């Protein structure tokens, strides 16, 4: 089976004037299809930087990256953007929904061709996904009128719209109270189990990490631990 992520020797150095910050110092990471993995680490340890590199939003200073068996680190910007839109899904701490558009439109829009409308098939899939995340009664609500947890459910439905190979979630529960955070994580577990979606979730919440199938720890620019079934019950 092809691995969804194969990263080898990933390094990242940021330059600000004369100052150099070495954030990632050689990351090797393999993630198989259907995994639900959490990455934990102190604030500033480089979690978002690594997710941005894997999400093709940022290029590594060194190292190689393959997603679903395809080398992506040396692609042109245009091909990287295309790969990102077609093969990856994103969930961020701040959902970035369009407040005046409905839940359905927020899920379907990113899948529409630039300048194109939402096709009937996209509408149907967006509605199905919103039902899947428990929002069948909020499909036509403007995003601004949804609660924080509901908005994050819309963001998950949106991430699933293109049937991505990998869903990258950066602190998806960071802005939610305990109960909403648990429900959002339950939903990701369900989508993982029932649809085989592969997740890489970065979180500073140990409660979230304990309920993922694998916990990776990032410390001082290196992956220092890799524990399968950290909660001991999946
Ligand atoms: P985390 O998500 O684990 O909190 P980040 O990946 O956001 O950590 O940041 C890791 C380190 O890299 C921090 O010291 C941060 O200041 C630095 N950093 C992140 N992005 C940039 C940037 N664009 N330019 C310079 N330094 C950056
Ligand atoms: Mg971060």
Curated annotation (Swiss-Prot):
Subcellular location: Cell inner membrane
Gene3D superfamilies, per the entry: P-loop containing nucleotide triphosphate hydrolases
Superkingdom per UniProt: Bacteria
Positions contributing to ATP binding: 41-48
Topology relative to the membrane: Peripheral membrane protein
Residues in ABC transporter domain copies: 5-231
Keywords on record: ATP-binding, Cell inner membrane, Cell membrane, Membrane, Nucleotide-binding, Translocase, Transport
SMART domains in alphabetical order: AAA (SM00382)
A GO molecular function held by the record: ATP binding
Keyword Ligase: no
Disulfide bonds: none
PROSITE patterns: ABC_TRANSPORTER_1, ABC_TRANSPORTER_2, LOLD
InterPro entries: AAA+_ATPase, ABC_transporter-like_ATP-bd, ABC_transporter-like_CS, ABC_transpr_LolD-like, MacB-like_ATP-bd, P-loop_NTPase
Main location group: membrane
GO CC annotations on file: plasma membrane
Signal peptide segment: none
Family to which this protein belongs: Belongs to the ABC transporter superfamily. Lipoprotein translocase (TC 3.A.1.125) family.
PANTHER family: IMPORT ATP-BINDING PROTEIN, LIPOPROTEIN-RELEASING SYSTEM ATP-BINDING PROTEIN LOLD
General function of this protein: Part of the ABC transporter complex LolCDE involved in the translocation of mature outer membrane-directed lipoproteins, from the inner membrane to the periplasmic chaperone, LolA. Responsible for the formation of the LolA-lipoprotein complex in an ATP-dependent manner.
Description of how the protein assembles with itself and partners: The complex is composed of two ATP-binding proteins (LolD) and two transmembrane proteins (LolC and LolE).
Protein name: Lipoprotein-releasing system ATP-binding protein LolD 1
UniProt source species: Caulobacter vibrioides (strain ATCC 19089 / CIP 103742 / CB 15) (Caulobacter crescentus)
Gene: lolD1
């Amino acid at each position: 089976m092809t691995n969804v992520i194969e990263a080898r020797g990933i390094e990242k150095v940021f330059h600000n004037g004369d100052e150099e910050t070495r954030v990632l110092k050689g990351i090797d990471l393999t993630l198989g299809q259907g995994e639900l993995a959490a990455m934990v680490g102190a604030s500033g340890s480089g979690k978002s930087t690594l997710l941005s590199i894997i999400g093709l939003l940022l290029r590594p200073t060194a190292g190689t990256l393959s997603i679903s068996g395809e080398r992506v680190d040396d692609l042109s910007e245009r091909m990287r953007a295309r790969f990102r839109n077609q093969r990856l899904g994103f969930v961020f701490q701040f959902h970035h929904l369009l407040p005046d558009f409905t839940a359905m439109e927020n899920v379907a829009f990113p899948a529409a061709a630039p300048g194109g409308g939402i096709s009937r098939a996209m509408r149907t899939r967006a509605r199905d996904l919103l039902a899947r995340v428990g929002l069948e009664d909020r499909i036509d609500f403007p995003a601004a009128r949804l609660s924080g947890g509901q908005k994050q459910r819309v963001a998950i439905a949106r991430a699933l719209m293109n049937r991505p190979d990998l869903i990258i979630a950066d602190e998806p529960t960071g802005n939610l109270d305990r109960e909403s955070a648990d429900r959002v994580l339950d939903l990701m577990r369900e989508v993982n189990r029932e649809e085989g979606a592969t997740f890489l979730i970065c979180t500073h919440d140990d409660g979230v990490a304990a309920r993922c199938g694998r916990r990776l720890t990032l410390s001082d620019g290196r992956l220092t631990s890799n524990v399968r079934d950290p909660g001991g019950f999946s």
